[in-house]
UniProtKB/Swiss-Prot annotation:
<comment type="subunit">
    <text>Part of the ribosomal stalk of the 50S ribosomal subunit. Interacts with L10 and the large rRNA to form the base of the stalk. L10 forms an elongated spine to which L12 dimers bind in a sequential fashion forming a multimeric L10(L12)X complex.</text>
</comment>
<keyword id="KW-0699">rRNA-binding</keyword>
<dbReference type="Pfam" id="PF03946">
    <property type="entry name" value="Ribosomal_L11_N"/>
</dbReference>
<comment type="function">
    <text>Forms part of the ribosomal stalk which helps the ribosome interact with GTP-bound translation factors.</text>
</comment>
<dbReference type="InterPro" id="IPR006519">
    <property type="entry name" value="Ribosomal_uL11_bac-typ"/>
</dbReference>
<dbReference type="GO" id="GO:0070180">
    <property type="term" value="F:large ribosomal subunit rRNA binding"/>
</dbReference>
<protein>
    <recommendedName>
        <fullName>Large ribosomal subunit protein uL11</fullName>
    </recommendedName>
</protein>
<dbReference type="GO" id="GO:0006412">
    <property type="term" value="P:translation"/>
</dbReference>
<dbReference type="GO" id="GO:0022625">
    <property type="term" value="C:cytosolic large ribosomal subunit"/>
</dbReference>
<dbReference type="InterPro" id="IPR020783">
    <property type="entry name" value="Ribosomal_uL11_C"/>
</dbReference>
<dbReference type="InterPro" id="IPR020785">
    <property type="entry name" value="Ribosomal_uL11_CS"/>
</dbReference>
<keyword id="KW-0689">Ribosomal protein</keyword>
<keyword id="KW-0687">Ribonucleoprotein</keyword>
<dbReference type="GO" id="GO:0003735">
    <property type="term" value="F:structural constituent of ribosome"/>
</dbReference>
<dbReference type="InterPro" id="IPR036769">
    <property type="entry name" value="Ribosomal_uL11_C_sf"/>
</dbReference>
<dbReference type="InterPro" id="IPR000911">
    <property type="entry name" value="Ribosomal_uL11"/>
</dbReference>
<comment type="similarity">
    <text>Belongs to the universal ribosomal protein uL11 family.</text>
</comment>
Length: 142
């Protein structure tokens, strides 16, 4: 018989840098999960990614206090900031532009995000990511 799911915990954890401090410790501790076991497994799974890149993770906690987790791709805004070489988006995106991003870069980000964005073709994903870029104050070229 399948194990009974007790909770789903959604977090954003830096790749290769999971440790028992907040937000990981309190979120998993209150569910009775072995925090260090999660940290070691998460760090092992994300060691190939750029260290410090925020990775969304969904942790499924079962009634016997065991767990499984699924990592997602980094948020589009993080990938856009990295591609444009900026630290943060514009506070006034319609008037103050902070950088530019090319269509090729948007294509690359859409391909990266394709695993998480279900039910959309590549053109729809590109439009979505271009919209995110514009809302951050980036100029989309192409």
């Amino acid at each position: 018989m399948a194990k009974k799911v007790e909770a789903y915990v959604k977090l954003q954890v830096a790749a290769g840098m999971a440790n028992p401090s907040p937000p990981v410790g309190p979120a998993l501790g209150q569910r009775g999960v072995n925090i260090m076991e999660f940290c070691k497994a998460f760090n092992a799974r994300t060691e190939s990614l750029e260290k410090g890149l925020p990775i969304p993770v969904v942790i499924t906690v079962y009634s016997d206090r065991s767990f499984t987790f699924e990592t997602k791709t980094p948020p589009a805004s993080v990938l856009l900031k990295k591609a444009a070489g900026i630290k943060s988006g514009s506070a006034r995106p319609n008037t103050a532009k902070v950088g530019t991003i090319t269509d090729a870069q948007i294509q690359e980000i859409a391909a990266t995000k394709a695993a998480d964005m279900t039910g959309a073709d590549i053109e729809a994903m590109k439009r979505s990511i271009a919209g995110t870029a514009r809302s951050m104050g980036l100029v989309v070229e192409g």
